[in-house]
């Protein structure tokens, strides 16, 4: 299906701290990828670099064959990259529908909604995440599980090709995690390329066919979950076992 994302020797330093250290990998179009590592491993910084909210110290980012390293966030959204955040921050006093409509105003969102209208397109997105019955209420009264769904709906609004999901299972009950797992499966089946940064391994390892492992800013492993969990370096880095 072709490569959609290429990360080449990507490095990000904050003063004397190297948060991402010479990371390289490629993502095929339509892939479903897990990104794991202990706290401080560099997962969120890597997402920030891909999404454009941080600038790399060295290296490059290629999307659909275009070098987007110097592109600002809004231009990357227009190219087809969208993300969620660990801490959900909806526009609290707009309705859930209006939160999604804001994202639909991007060029890709407008193009996708041209035949049906932006409000109908936004409603379709809310329905796809199971929130159509909450369309007219403000997110400040939503339970946390629904806020996580709204976060995904907002990311879908600009009609992305690549979705970066930052800890979508965090803070959820097992039942709520299962709902999000099924939603992610559905989105991947619809053709979205998805990278999930997560520390809840039980759900993630059963969901994705490929896992990237980061530790101290470095990419230390890349492969199927069954292989990853048996690599000594991964066990030591993630579980704190060994010397």
Residues of each region from the PLM?
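Glycine-rich phosphate-binding loops of nucleotide-dependent enzymes
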Residues: 2-243
């Amino acid at each position: 299906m072709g490569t959609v994302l290429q990360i080449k020797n990507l490095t990000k330093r904050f003063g004397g701290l190297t948060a991402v250290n010479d990371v390289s990998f490629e993502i095929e179009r339509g892939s479903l990828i897990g990104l794991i590592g202990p706290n401080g491993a560099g997962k969120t910084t890597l997402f920030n670099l891909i999404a454009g909210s941080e600038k790399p110290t060295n290296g490059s980012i290629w999307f659909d064959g275009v070098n987007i390293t110097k592109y600002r966030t809004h231009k990357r959204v227009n190219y087809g990259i969208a993300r969620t955040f660990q801490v959900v921050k909806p526009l609290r006093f707009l309705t859930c529908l209006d939160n999604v409509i804001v994202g639909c105003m991007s060029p890709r969102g407008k193009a996708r909604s041209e035949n049906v209208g932006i409000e109908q397109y936004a409603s379709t997105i809310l329905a796809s995440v199971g929130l159509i019955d909450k369309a007219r209420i403000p997110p400040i009264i939503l339970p946390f599980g629904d806020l996580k769904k709204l976060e995904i709906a907002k990311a879908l609004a600009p009609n992305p090709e690549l979705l970066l999901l930052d800890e979508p299972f965090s803070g959820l009950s097992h039942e709520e995690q299962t709902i999000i797992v099924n939603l992610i499966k559905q989105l991947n089946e619809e053709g979205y390329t998805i990278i999930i940064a997560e520390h809840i391994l039980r759900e993630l390892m059963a969901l994705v066919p490929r896992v990237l492992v980061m530790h101290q800013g470095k990419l230390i492993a890349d492969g199927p979950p069954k292989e990853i969990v048996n690599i000594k370096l991964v066990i030591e880095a993630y579980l704190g076992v060994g010397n």
